[in-house]
């Protein structure tokens, strides 16, 4: 099931797109995340990357677009890294990563003592990641709970069964998951809202101004007691301390949204 098709009962993703996102971040950052190198070095991943590289190399315009997308993904990743680390430093002790894929934040971020990280995705994706990292000897920096969810399972129930406490503030991350079809997106955000105690936070990327009448996720949150901030992605190079505009065309309609539940 593709991210764009993820329903409210399933936050399933495929290994393929997550491999490409991980590769994109690694390529732009000089692979300074050793865990990304671990995940990219396994045979089935190398096969995916080789097929993708062959397709990209055939079309110069596609190669240029790939570089822009990779650049954006790397900047987006660093933005969310900082947001999650700051929220944890301010006292939140549980984080839920939706459609986690090959995300390694449970292992590589400087989580404080007592931090719990839940990762929701297809069981096959989470098993692949766990096996690769375990074989490498990597250890999570938090109390890590991979939450495997099949397509016919309600993900909130699986989250509760894994030890999630909805009475405590939560940091939610939905990186690369939105936008979704209107009804699906509204239902997903409503479920997150219902599971969030006051003081909870959420971070996600969205596409703004592309489709008139499309469900407005930041507006939905604001109307339900969340303080919302929107950073247009075209400002990411500046926020990253860079002056180039390589990612400008790709980020023209992208935005990074963060919000805190006030009531």
From Swiss-Prot:
EC number annotated for this UniProt entry: 2.1.1.-
Signal peptide: none
Species: Mycobacterium sp. (strain KMS)
GO biological process: methylation
Database matches in InterPro entries: Ppm1/Ppm2/Tcmp, SAM-dependent_MTases_sf, SAM_mthyl_Trfase_ML2640-like
Alphabetical UniProt keywords: Methyltransferase, S-adenosyl-L-methionine, Transferase
Protein residues bound to S-adenosyl-L-methionine: 121, 150-151
Highest taxon listed in the record's lineage: Bacteria
Name of the protein in its database record: Putative S-adenosyl-L-methionine-dependent methyltransferase Mkms_0098
GO MF term list: methyltransferase activity
Disulfide-linked positions: none
NCBIfam families in UniProt: mthyl_TIGR00027
Enzyme category, top tier: transferase
Family: Belongs to the UPF0677 family.
Function: Exhibits S-adenosyl-L-methionine-dependent methyltransferase activity.
């Amino acid at each position: 099931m593709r991210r764009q098709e993820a329903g409210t009962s399933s936050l399933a993703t495929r290994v393929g797109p997550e491999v490409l996102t991980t590769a994109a971040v690694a390529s732009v950052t000089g692979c300074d995340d050793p865990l990304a190198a671990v995940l990219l070095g396994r045979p089935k991943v190398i096969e995916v990357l080789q097929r993708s590289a062959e397709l990209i190399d055939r079309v110069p315009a596609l190669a240029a677009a790939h570089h822009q997308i990779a650049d954006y993904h790397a900047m987006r990743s660093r933005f969310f890294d900082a947001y999650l680390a700051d929220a944890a430093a301010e006292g939140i002790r549980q984080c839920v990563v939706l459609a986690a894929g090959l995300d390694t934040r449970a292992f590589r971020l400087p989580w404080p003592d007592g931090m719990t990280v839940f990762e929701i995705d297809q069981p096959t994706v989470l098993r692949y990641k766990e096996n690769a990292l375990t074989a490498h000897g990597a250890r999570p920096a938090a109390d890590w709970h991979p939450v495997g969810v099949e397509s016919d399972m309600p993900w909130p129930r699986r989250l509760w069964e894994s030890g999630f406490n909805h009475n405590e503030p939560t940091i939610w991350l939905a990186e690369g998951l939105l936008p979704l079809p209107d009804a699906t997106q509204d239902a997903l955000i409503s479920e997150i809202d219902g599971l969030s105690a006051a003081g909870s936070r959420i971070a996600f990327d969205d596409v703004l101004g592309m489709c008139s009448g499309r469900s407005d996720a930041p507006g939905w949150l604001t109307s339900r007691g969340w303080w919302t901030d929107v950073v247009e992605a075209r400002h990411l190079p500046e926020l990253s301390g860079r002056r180039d505009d390589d990612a400008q065309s790709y980020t023209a309609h992208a935005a990074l949204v963060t919000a805190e539940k006030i009531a």
